[in-house]
Amino acid sequence: MLKLVDLEKKINSELTTKIRNSEIKHNQIYVEIEKDNLMDVVLFLKTNKNTRFSQLIDITVVDYPEESQRFKVVYLFLSHEFNQRLILNYSINENEVINSLTSVFPSANWMEREVFDMYGVIFKNHPDLRRILTDYNFEGHPLRKDFPLTGHTEVRYNEEEKKVVSEPVKLEQNYRNFDY
């Protein structure tokens, strides 16, 4: 079993041209790559006898609206065999399409759907990329920092029409303090 420092060196030596940066923090390896290298890096991490990161724990996104590359896509991997964790990330522009990991990790399916639903990141070659947490007619992506806290519409049951209706949000402004 490789120590964490040796494992980081091994990954860097094998993937020299594909890794932008790596470091060890909080007893985990953090690796930054370019988005075009995702599949090569993930396949290496999963199949190499010295790494064996066989479980994809999570996929998430961090929104930096002020940056030129607005989103940082973050993948968390676990090697059961070596009891190690690795966090892989890369940055993308708002409208970039990225590769789906569902062909390598079938568990990525719902994780990628959640990222699509909450942030609007589109995954190429995903077998079923549709909303998973919000309604199909929901407007916007609620975890983006530019999404209004109250949302765009209010959904409620209308007793007179005997059905669920969607209306623009109406908020009283009388008691709000706009002096930031």
Predicted regions and their residues:
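Terminal low-complexity/charged segments
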Residues: 1-180
